[in-house]
Amino acid sequence: MGDIRVIGGHLCFVLFLILSGQAFGRGFGPYPHLVVSRSRAAPSNGVRVTYLGTNGYQFESKGHALLVDPYFSRVNLLSVAFGAPIEPNASRINDGLRHLASYPDAILVTHGHFDHLLDVPFIMARTRARLIASTSCVDLAKRAGALPGDPVKPGDVRRIGPWTIRVLPAKHDRLFGKVPFDRPAARVTVPRRAADWNCGEPLAFLIEVNGQRIYIDSGGTPEQLPLIKSGNGRMDLAILGVALPDSRARLNAALERLHPRYILPSHQDNFFRPLNAGFQFGPLTDFSRVQRECAQQNGSRLILLDYFKPWTLPKAAGSKWQNPKRETD
């Protein structure tokens, strides 16, 4: 009976997306002034950030690169909703990799859903990058053909090249009252359907490099973030997934805790559309609310990034945290 209710909920979600999809136009709508980008030249100061779609990012500093949740295949909606087999799209992944560093130091994954982990085994094989994720994610990726990864839990710290990576607890937002695909599928060895890519333990990451601090989650910011003891407790950049109501309800508390110089809302796009179709806000996003919440944060600047258009996170002048100036983008 529970399975029937879950299936019914998924079908309602599909119907909602299909019926509402026409209401969401292409591009950034009334928010193009928030989109930042800079030249593709490697930064001499600061960290270069490239948005890969969904909750995917590349960070670059001092000739090194780090990936988070890279996902280029963009599996279509109906395949996900009706349990059809899904697999990485090699052509789309190769197109995405052309925008990235050849050999990233590591791939961080926030949780095991297909829109975060599906492409990772393919990318690991191409780039020889090391996977850093929860035990459940590492196991899921291995069953999908990846080399053994580095399982981590909240409180762990990894140092790779110039990167210090602190693992933090996170949550996953509910959809119609339930975390989607929240438990392993029974008797599944190799993940083949979207439901096989179960959430596992969600994680967030605090990335420190070149004297800068970046917080990233995929929408699972806890009501109370743990005390971050390193540095001054403030973030240079907070990348916060706010695709669903749960995370939007916690947004103000998260911003009060992080007090970032720059706020980058994430997981805002329609991740069932191919990347070459351009950015489109997802049908469950409420960016106007996100903008209002962020406007209450004194000294923080709200930004958006477009696909594969790098932006350099400026290093704060001097040793003291300063309000970010609005630069010409």
Predicted regions, residues:
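Short, low-complexity, charge-dense intrinsically disordered segments
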Residues: G2-L11, S20
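Zn-dependent metallo-beta-lactamase
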Residues: L17-P88, R193, A317
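Pre-active-site segment of Zn-dependent metallo-hydrolases
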Residues: V35-R40, H64-V109, H113, L118-F122, ...
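Beta-strand-turn-beta hairpins that frame and shape the catalytic cleft
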Residues: A41-V47, S61-L66, V157-R166, E208-I214
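Active-site neighborhood of phospho(di)ester-bond hydrolases with catalytic His/Asp-centered motifs
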Residues: V68-D69, Y103-H113, I132-S134, Y215-G220, ...
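Active-site HxH/HxHxD metal-binding segment of metal-dependent hydrolases
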Residues: L77, D95-R158, W163-K178
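Binuclear metal-ion centers of metallo-dependent hydrolases, dominated by the metallo-beta-lactamase
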Residues: K142-G145, G149-V157, E256, R261-D329
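Active-site-proximal loop/helix segments of hydrolase catalytic cores
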Residues: V188-L258
